[in-house]
Amino acid sequence: MNPSEMQRKGPPRRWCLQVYPTAPKRQRPSRTGHDDDGGFVEKKRGKCGEKQERSDCYCVCVERSRHRRLHFVMC
């Protein structure tokens, strides 16, 4: 086979990576119980004892595994 026959026919391949933005800086709580805008962040315990923080814009669930690693889940 010559190099021209080895080329793939059709449109060229393009790699596409989607990067999801993180929460804007104003939505991240800087102090426990408060967000950056001065609003209060409500804390709860879930069914399995995981910590849940809920503010006006988002909810963060912190789960603890048996290997003592924290898993952050955006709700």
From Swiss-Prot:
Source organism (scientific name)? Homo sapiens (Human)
Tagged with keyword Nucleus: yes
Q: Does the keyword Nucleus apply?
A: yes
The record's account of tissue expression is: Transcript detectable in many tumor cell lines and tumor tissues.
* Subcellular localization: Nucleus
Q: Ranges of Basic and acidic residues compositional bias?
A: 32-43
Region Disordered, residue ranges? 22-43
Additional remarks: Protein expressed at very low level. This Np9 protein is encoded by a human specific provirus.
Purpose: May possess a function in tumorigenesis.
- Keyword set, alphabetical order: ERV, Nucleus, Transposable element
Q: Which domain of life is it from?
A: Eukaryota
Q: What is this protein called?
A: Endogenous retrovirus group K member 24 Np9 protein
One cellular-component annotation, GO:
nucleus
Assign the protein's first listed, main location to one coarse class: nucleus
Q: Where are the disulfide bridges?
A: none
